[in-house]
Amino acid sequence: MNLKKILSAILVLFLACSITSLSADARWFEKYSSFVPSNAVGENEVWVGTFQLVWNDFQDKIVKAPVKFEEGTPKLVDELNRQPFSSSMLSDNSYFKAYGEKSLELKEEIENGLMEKFGEKSAIIDSIDWTSGQGYVVYAMLKKEFKYLSAFPEIEAAPFYGSGESVRYFWIDKNTSNPTLYQNVDVLFYNSANSYAIKLKTKEGEEIILYRTDDNKSFDDLYSAVMKKQKRFWFGKKELGEQDLLKVPYIKFSKQFSYDELCNKKIVGTNGLFIDKAIQTVEFGLDNQGGNLKSEAMVISTMSLIRRDGGREFFFDKPFVLFMKEANQDRPYFALKVKNSDLLEKVSKQ
């Protein structure tokens, strides 16, 4: 069964802001498409802010003006030019950026910077020739690792939304022997057995928002819906009660995306500069203890030479959306729609 039939929407937001940010004015999200570029993974969808970080520096430091193409500018470029996400919405210890003329010296700066800050090596910088041609490279890495306040127990593997294969889940049931688990979870709203959202809290101040919905809408519309519904749930029970149930699937995937629609088009006012390559990677994992996110992005430009017992059930075993944000920020840096089990961690066959 495809991912669309399994998860109609998953938004994972790590936002550096408190939950009060969800009640902020939602009209900003409706005016522009702010989760760009959004990437299809089968019938699932993922967004992370890393490419926007790279684009911001490409626009501000290299082109030094809004990017326009001589042969016509696509909508994606106009949306990126608005810079709806920036490094000011992230803590300094969660990202690394570098830009400059393409050279072995810049490559070494990136390698040393990543190792010093994250103890990481890049998976993409060796994909280009650093010695040929005139041009520029803009690079960024976003990295997050987080642990829940308490680790959740794992439940027996089960299918996701009718899929033919079982996936792993963690959960809280009404007979849990660890009452501290409830401190991991805030209820944002519960409107019905098919419309609810929760927030998972972490030791590092990251917030994972899980929204159960079948709506096939944009991340902007989905996040706006969470904010509006949470604001209206002022009378509801905000804590997970002893009769409430929670079930969340493990998530694990690694993908690379290329944005060919941005490439090989001369940029206005640059004497022939064009984007030669625009790429982004996403690695994401979520399990019963916490999770991790690592994403790289790079733009290379070149000069032309030419429910139970009355309790509620918060089960994320059907289409859902996931957002990730820092607790003191009001913009997410990661979003994910899960429609099937393609991105979920499978049970090994014995």
Language model segments and positions:
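Hydrophobic-core positions in well-structured secondary-structure elements of globular domains
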Residues: 23-350
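Bacterial N-terminal signal peptides that target proteins for export
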Residues: 1-10
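Bacterial N-terminal signal peptides
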Residues: 10-18
